[in-house]
C-alpha cells in the first residue's frame, strides 16, 4: 500500500544560458505565470506535504518572486547534474514518505499525469514517466529486458544499438525517501559528462530486484522542457490551444481560438462571445451573454450579465454590473465600478470611480476618485481634477445631474442632485441641488480681424 505522504523536489538551478537573459530561466513566463510557478501549483494541487526547490543561479530573484509559496530552499552551489541536485535535497527526505522529482522548466506537466504516476509506483520500487518519440536524439533511452525497465542510458553514453530505442526518459520519477537516499549515495560521475545522473538510480533499483513502473503522460507536451525562447513560445501556443479548446467545449464562443490568450483563470456564464485577439489575465468572471470585442484586455475583473465590451478596451481590477456597455477604446483602471446599465464610451478613462445606474460618459473623459450617481450625463471632454501634485481628492456627483461638454470639476467638490453644469464650466465650489452653474470667459467679436502673417 502506497504511503500517502509525499514531498516534491523541483530542480531549478540551471542558468538557462540559451535564453540569453538576466532572468533565471524558470522565471520566464508561460501564460502570464513563471514556468516554475506552474510546477509549484501542480505540486500543491497534488497534495505535497513539502515542496523543496533546488536553486543556484539567480537565487535572490527566485526567492523574491516566489516569496508567497511555502518552499524549502535548497542551494546547489555547483551544477554537477540532476543526481547532485537531488543529493543536496536528500537530507530533508523522510524515510517513509514518497519523493516526487519535477523540473522548473517543464511547465505543462499535469496533475492528472502525476496522480497516475504516484498511483502506479510499486511498493519499494520506482514510478518513472516515459514517452516514445519518433526522433529521440539527445534524450536518455529506456532499456528493458523481457519488457521490464532495467535502466536509462544517456544519449552521449549510448551505443549505436541503444540509440535506436524510441522510448525516452522524461526525468520525472517517484520513489520512497529511504530508498532514494540510499541510491543517491551510490551515484558516481563515471560518464561522458562527468556528472551525477539521477537516472542511474533506475539501474541501482533494478539490481536490487525492485520494480520500475513506466507511465506515459496523456500528452507528450506535458514533459517538454524549455531551453530557449523558441521552445517557450511553442509551449505557450500549445497551452493556449488547450485552454481555448476547454472553453469552446464549455460553451464559450471564441471567434478564432488561435487568437485568444488566457493568462489566468476564467469563470463564465452561458452564451459568452469573445472576438479575436482578446487577452484574459488574472482572475476574471464573465456573466451570461457577455460580448467582448476584438483586441480587448480584461484583467482581474467581474463582468456582469449582458455586458458588452467594444473593441480595444482595457478593463483592470474593475466591476461591471449587468447590462453595462463600454468602449471602443475605453480604459477602466483599478477601482472602477459601473452599476447596472451604465455606459462608458470611446476614450473614457476611469480610476477609483463609481458610475451609477443608467449613467453615461460617452466620449473623451477622465473620471478619477469620483462617486457619480444614477442617470447622470457626463459630457464629452469632462475631467475630474483629482490631483494637486501631492494628494488625491474626491468628486461627488448626485443623481440626475447633467454635465456639459468640456467641464472641469476641481476636487474636492460635490454637485447636488438634478444640477446642470453648462458646457465649458470649471467647477471649483460645491453645487446645490437643481442649480445651474456656468463659468465662461465673455465672448468677444472683432469685425474685420486680420490674421497675423509670417514675416
UniProtKB/Swiss-Prot annotation:
- What cofactor(s) does the depicted protein rely on? Mg(2+)
Gene Ontology molecular functions = glucosamine-1-phosphate N-acetyltransferase activity; magnesium ion binding; UDP-N-acetylglucosamine diphosphorylase activity
GO CC terms, sorted: cytoplasm; membrane
Name the positions where UDP-N-acetyl-alpha-D-glucosamine binds.
11-14, 25, 76, 81-82, 103-105, 140, 154, 169, 227, 333, 351, 366, 377
- Tell me the pathway: Nucleotide-sugar biosynthesis; UDP-N-acetyl-alpha-D-glucosamine biosynthesis; N-acetyl-alpha-D-glucosamine 1-phosphate from alpha-D-glucosamine 6-phosphate (route II): step 2/2; Nucleotide-sugar biosynthesis; UDP-N-acetyl-alpha-D-glucosamine biosynthesis; UDP-N-acetyl-alpha-D-glucosamine from N-acetyl-alpha-D-glucosamine 1-phosphate: step 1/1; Bacterial outer membrane biogenesis; LPS lipid A biosynthesis
Q: What does this protein do?
A: Catalyzes the last two sequential reactions in the de novo biosynthetic pathway for UDP-N-acetylglucosamine (UDP-GlcNAc). The C-terminal domain catalyzes the transfer of acetyl group from acetyl coenzyme A to glucosamine-1-phosphate (GlcN-1-P) to produce N-acetylglucosamine-1-phosphate (GlcNAc-1-P), which is converted into UDP-GlcNAc by the transfer of uridine 5-monophosphate (from uridine 5-triphosphate), a reaction catalyzed by the N-terminal domain.
Q: What is this protein called?
A: Bifunctional protein GlmU
Q: Which organism is it from?
A: Salmonella arizonae (strain ATCC BAA-731 / CDC346-86 / RSK2980)
